[in-house]
C-alpha cells in the first residue's frame, strides 16, 4: 500500500539533529560525523519505521549506525521511534544517522574509507519476476557495491520471509565471495540469541511464515 504524502515530514526531519539531508557530502568521512569517532559503523539498508534501529542503537551506544530509506514519510516515523526508544532508556542519541538514499546508488554516499563493519538487510522487496531480480538488495550487482565499503571480515545480516529470495541469495553471496557463517530457515525456533523483531517480521510470524536468516562474511 502506498503511503500518503506528508508535507510536514521533511521540515520535521530537517529540524532533527541526527538527520542527514545530503549524505553525499560525507562520503569517505562518515566516522567524523559521529560524537565517538572510534566506534565501529553498522549500516541498515531500508530502515522502514525504525523499529530495528531504535532497539539496536539504544542498546549499543558503543556502535555508530547509519540508517537509510528513500521516503521522508517513512523516515519521519523512524525518527520518532528512535527518539522514543532513547528517551525511554534515558540514553544520549549520538550514535545514529538517519538519511534519505536510493539503495541502488549506495556507492554515491559510501566508499572504502568508511570501513563499514556490518550491514543489515531486513525484509527487502523480493522482486520475484526474473526481469526485476537485479533490483534485489542481495543481487550480485549490489553485493559488489557493498564489498567496496565493507571491511574484510565484515558481515551482512539478512532476514526475509521469502523462500525463493533466501535460496537465491545464498547463491548470490557465494558468487560474490562471501562465506555463510550462520544460517537458519526458522529463526524464531533456532536459539539465535539477539534478534530484534521488526514490524514486518511480527506480521509474517503471526501468519505462520517462518523467518529465514543468515550471516555472510566478506572474504
UniProtKB/Swiss-Prot annotation:
Residues bound to substrate: 129, 161
Family: Belongs to the class I-like SAM-binding methyltransferase superfamily. TrmB family.
GO MF term (any one): tRNA (guanine(46)-N7)-methyltransferase activity
NCBIfam families referenced in this protein's UniProt entry, alphabetically: PRK00121.2-2 (NF001080), tRNA (guanosine(46)-N7)-methyltransferase TrmB (TIGR00091)
Reaction it catalyzes: guanosine(46) in tRNA + S-adenosyl-L-methionine = N(7)-methylguanosine(46) in tRNA + S-adenosyl-L-homocysteine
InterPro entries in the cross-refs: SAM-dependent_MTases_sf, tRNA_(Gua-N-7)_MeTrfase_Trmb, tRNA_methyltr_TrmB_bact
Pathway: tRNA modification; N(7)-methylguanine-tRNA biosynthesis
Binding site for S-adenosyl-L-methionine: 44, 69, 102, 125
Native source organism of the sequence: Clostridium perfringens (strain SM101 / Type A)
Keyword annotations of the record: Methyltransferase, S-adenosyl-L-methionine, Transferase, tRNA processing
Protein name: tRNA (guanine-N(7)-)-methyltransferase
EC number: 2.1.1.33
Single GO cellular component term: tRNA methyltransferase complex
Keyword tRNA processing appears in the UniProt entry: yes
Name of the encoding gene: trmB
Keyword Methyltransferase attributed: yes
Amino acid at each position: 500500500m502506498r503511503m500518503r504524502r506528508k508535507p510536514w515530514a521533511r521540515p520535521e526531519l530537517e529540524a532533527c539533529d541526527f538527520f542527514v539531508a545530503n549524505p553525499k557530502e560525507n562520503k569517505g568521512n562518515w566516522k567524523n560525523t559521529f560524537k565517538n569517532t572510534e566506534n565501529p559503523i553498522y549500516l541498515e539498508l531500508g530502515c522502514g519505521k525504525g523499529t530495528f534501529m531504535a532497539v539496536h542503537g539504544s542498546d549499543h551506544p558503543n556502535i555508530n549506525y547509519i540508517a537509510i530509506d528513500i521516503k521522508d514519510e517513512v523516515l519521519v516515523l523512524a525518527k520518532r521511534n528512535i527518539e522514543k526508544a532513547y528517551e525511554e532508556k534515558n540514553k544520549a542519541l549520538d550514535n545514529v544517522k538517519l538519511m534519505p538514499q536510493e539503495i541502488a546508488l549506495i556507492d554515491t554516499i559510501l566508499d572504502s574509507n568508511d570501513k563499514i563493519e556490518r550491514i543489515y538487510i531486513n525484509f527487502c522487496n523480493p522482486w520475484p519476476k526474473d526481469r526485476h531480480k537485479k533490483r534485489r538488495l542481495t543481487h550480485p550487482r549490489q553485493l559488489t557495491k557493498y564489498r567496496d565499503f565493507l571491511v574484510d571480515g565484515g558481515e551482512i545480516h539478512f532476514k526475509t520471509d521469502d523462500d525463493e529470495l533466501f535460496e537465491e541469495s545464498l547463491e548470490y553471496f557465494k558468487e560474490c565471495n562471501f562465506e555463510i557463517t550462520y544460517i537458519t530457515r526458522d529463526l524464531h525456533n533456532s536459539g539465535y540469541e539477539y534478534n530484534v523483531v521488526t514490524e514486518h517480521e511480527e506480521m509474517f510470524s503471526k501468519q505462520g511464515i517462518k523467518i529465514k536468516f543468515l550471516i555472510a562474511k566478506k572474504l
